[in-house]
């Protein structure tokens, strides 16, 4: 076992409980802060102040909004599946909390005289646990859309499922190069492998793919198609209110914090101090509680990227979003992994330095990526004089374009007949005559 695993194995129960409560409190506070910071930054981008009333600088605005949601009426649609409808927000929020348990926040510290590592659990396959939790979280969204009994939530949940499937592949491929260079699936081992250099500089294309994938995984702008207001009203949480609606917001922002912390762990050296601070005093800033500060600063930098993208980029069309994942990220990631594999093989033979090959490979991949965006899409020629009929590529049911006949209009006699008093035949009245069967009057 590694040193981190040995430290965590000796943790008493009370220390484990303290870590669990601390992680939960940290994620909740980060959620409240992220919502406030996002609204303030977006406000500045749009030349308005943002929330500035509740508390100093508006810091208590998120807490006030949470309390407001807690006291709102909890409405359940008539057609909703009761238990699935209630459990869906919990299923969406729980995996995000679990995923953070394997992320190292710092090194070895002393807590009430007990030596431990600032990490809840150390697993040999910790990276796969994070990937699995990211996949499980979409179940809550799918169940929410299906159980609401409404078409808009169902469409939003299906979009989210397709989105996660598409970008989970690209995210997993971005992990492969990191695993090859770190030689382990352990998150603490990956952090230790970056003490001499960040993987973001060594594996720039993997870093870029992960950043794009993490935005798609969290359903954030410009990839917020599952909850597109202009198309789906509110998406998968259209029919939710009160605390269940707040749970979806909590899950979204906890996911943002988790993927940002994972990006810090995989590509920015984790809790290690950035250069040149890491060289001060022989690495004294990488000991004690200092690593928490570096980890928090890097995580906040990634959270700012989410806000920046939301404030600057418009929402993509659904076909553009799928094309980006399947036609660009996945194929280029496979080419990048092949290049990294060749580099590792040549490095073992001392033929060429890995840095030279990685720089050359990154340039080639960047050129290919730019070229794919510049090449126009091939369009199928369309005939102006033909109408698509049933049996074509997109079958259209035959339409009866004949104008319907006007309904018969009632005459004055019929109208008077309907108004005849009781006991009087239609057409009879004052001054009317009745014809006898023999023709006499």
Curated annotation (Swiss-Prot):
CC per GO annotation: plasma membrane
UniProt keyword annotation of 4Fe-4S present: no
Catalytic activity: a quinone + NADH + 5 H(+)(in) = a quinol + NAD(+) + 4 H(+)(out)
Transmembrane stretches, start-end: 13-33, 83-103, 123-143, 164-184, 197-217, 243-263, 289-309, 323-343, 356-376
Region span, Disordered: 400-441
Recorded topology in the membrane: Multi-pass membrane protein
Coiled coil: none
Superkingdom to which the source organism belongs: Bacteria
InterPro entries: NADH_UbQ_OxRdtase_su1/FPO (IPR001694), NADH_UbQ_OxRdtase_su1_CS (IPR018086)
Broad class of the protein's primary localization: membrane
GO annotation terms (biological process): aerobic respiration
Entry-linked PROSITE patterns: COMPLEX1_ND1_1, COMPLEX1_ND1_2
EC number: 7.1.1.-
Complex formation: NDH-1 is composed of 14 different subunits. Subunits NuoA, H, J, K, L, M, N constitute the membrane sector of the complex.
Function noted in UniProt: NDH-1 shuttles electrons from NADH, via FMN and iron-sulfur (Fe-S) centers, to quinones in the respiratory chain. The immediate electron acceptor for the enzyme in this species is believed to be ubiquinone. Couples the redox reaction to proton translocation (for every two electrons transferred, four hydrogen ions are translocated across the cytoplasmic membrane), and thus conserves the redox energy in a proton gradient. This subunit may bind ubiquinone.
Protein name: NADH-quinone oxidoreductase subunit H
